[in-house]
Amino acid sequence: MRLRNGTVATALVFITTFLSLSWYTAWQNGKEKLMAYQREFHALKERLRIAEHRTLQRSSELHAILDHFRRMIKEANGSRDALNHFSDETQKLIKDLTNRKALQVPNIYYHMPHLLNHDGSLQPAVQVGLGRTGVSVVMGIPTVKRRVKSYLKETLHSLIDKLSPEEKLDCVIIVFVGETDLEYVNSVVASLQKEFATEISSGLVEVISPPATYYPDLNNLKETFGDSKERVRWRTKQNLDYCFLMMYAQRKGIYYIQLEDDIVAKQNYFSTIKNFALQLSSEDWMILEFSQLGFIGKMFQAPDITLIVEFILMFYKEKPIDWLLDHILWVKVCNPEKDAKHCDRQKSNLRIRFRPSLFQHVGLHSSLAGKIQKLTDKDFLKPLLHKIHVNPPAEVSTSLKVYQGHTLEKTYLGEDFFWAITPVAGDYILFKFDKPVNVERYLFRSGNPEHPGDQLWNTTVEVLPYRKDIVELRSDTKDKRLSDGFFRIGKFEDGLAEGPVNSYLNPISALRLSVLQNSAVWVILNEIHIKRNPAD
């Protein structure tokens, strides 16, 4: 009897274990499918945005053609013979077009009038490749003749060798040879065709160069910011090179990332870039940065390239590209009546930095003759000790004593982890939003791999509703309301505070972490995520 009972118990344990494993496997598969559907939905959303932008582009191009037609008609009006061979219907249409007094919208020819002197000034003089379109990520690599050493082949090998077969079908790498000497350009093309024959024939790699007529006269530029004549010429041409490359790349994919011809890439860089962009698909970002150096690793959404190129062309003679990019952000979101800190907070929502860096600069000799640049990205090999999220613009403050520059501001912006000396009862961390925010969820994670014990204990999460009168009418919130108007909605457990924010508390003016008891350890916050409601 005892043996029989043991057999039954064993069978029950086996069946229970089997059912549990089956349930867990089904749940895990369902979760993975849901995540895959979410990624596909975000990708579809981006493609629809691209399609809408291209429709507007076609409309703009049709208006440009119409303007050109008007100019031709105006020139022909002086000659009756020039119009005699048209039908009566066409002549009526010509008359209607001539009589319309439409305003003239500035375009690229306004800033670069020399382009009107030659047909094909905006068409590549050399174009090698299949012209692949419809990809997720377009990578642009400008290159020019270097007097000492070219790093182009090493750069391409680093990018291509770290792509999986599937990833090679979802991107295109454009090499822009910024030279008008066709003999030199063709030598570069021949060299790349020999080294990367498979990649070019498959459509992964393209090579283009601009016509000589694309460039204006660069010999009489005004010297500014203490730069020499040669440096002003170099940076001005560089701005024009970037614009040509971006205009060519815009229609090919969802995202465009700017690289250089003297870099190396990290393993899995492509999937990291794509997944990070998809995670932020609901955010109103303009630049994602995957390197802290210059223009390396700066990624844009295809529709935004129009604005960026237009802005650069307005001031291409005045300042370097990285300065102009910062000015675009300032114009979009900074209030002249607010201080620099407020401006930086606003810009941080448009310019989001990913760490650790995915690209490292390796070139010693600059494309500017005689310039040695020992530039390295210090974040390239750093382990990631914090997680990056886009949080609502807010003024952050704390009563805790910060350790070695690991400030709360940097953590909130996703630039670093927050590290502070031993908390005591009454200490707080406060996030005061620039404007009331509808918050869907919150997440605060303390400790990190190097200091796992530096966690928050006996700490609560509290929110301050913007509409206090409505909240006070609810009987179920009385016990959660504090004397200063905040409502306690959660607490840290095992170093983590995570949960939803009830809709009746929204919108929220501020969020606070309050320490209830003295702690025996220091504290690290390595992740802060205040997730806005998508409908906000």
Swiss-Prot record:
Parts of the chain that traverse the membrane: 7-27
InterPro entries: Glyco_transf_54, MGAT4_A/B/C_C
Glycan-carrying positions: 77, 458
Short name of one Pfam family: MGAT4A_C
Pathway(s) this gene product operates in, as recorded in its UniProt entry: Protein modification; protein glycosylation
Record entry for activity regulation: Inhibited by UDP.
The keyword Secreted appears for this protein: yes
Protein name as catalogued: Alpha-1,3-mannosyl-glycoprotein 4-beta-N-acetylglucosaminyltransferase A
